[in-house]
């Protein structure tokens, strides 16, 4: 099976390569909705990659609503790639959007999601946020990719208990992960200090969630994404004809309070 799967891998980021291989495996091996994929370790062995890369690929497919990872049970197919229209990883107009346009959309969406989540979060939701934050800490120590970052933002959306808001969040992250300019910028974020600062932002957001303070949660999320934007501005090539940093400026955080 390994040679058949490996031939589908193209020149992308490792987790995207594995995700593409898994999509093709689902199509070519006639899997059906409800079928179970091989376990994480077996996939890693088949593709000769680390389990961390496989885990990131599975998160990507979860964001696309193709699979569901059930703790203690396995990886299940919930939709077939060829059955779904407008899959986020397929070429679309949104992939032509610049990273700052995406960030502006995320600020508007996620700050309001955080505000609402602070009023709805259960003890289990808070536990999920804590777990994602701990994963971020672990990844920072080992230098792994930012799986915990995605999990933290998704845990906040899930705390709203509104499936549409969760889906909007999933789609925005899928667009982010497949946006060419975002990926280009992301490769320049080698300094761990940025990630430490963003993790500190997440701690502030979590504190607001625990206190059930919607205004503080909204402000903290807005400021977090503003900090991400400022980091990307520092790393951007302003002479790039596709640079959109000054076209999608955000409101100062003090205006968000009003």
Give the location of each predicted region.
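Short linear motifs at protein or domain termini
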Residues: 1-115, 119, 253-258
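C-terminal effector-binding regulatory domain of bacterial HTH transcription factors
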Residues: 2-4, 215-258
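Short, 15-30-residue, compositionally biased linear elements
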Residues: 14-15, 193-199
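Short helix-coil transition/hinge motifs at the ends and kinks of transmembrane helices
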Residues: 90-92, 185-193, 242
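Short coil/turn linker motifs that delimit alpha-helical repeat modules in TPR/alpha-solenoid proteins
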Residues: 102, 141, 193-194
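Conserved amphipathic alpha-helical segments that form helical-bundle/coiled-coil interaction surfaces
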Residues: 105-183, 199-202, 207, 216-230, ...
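Well-ordered alpha/beta subsegment
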Residues: 210-211
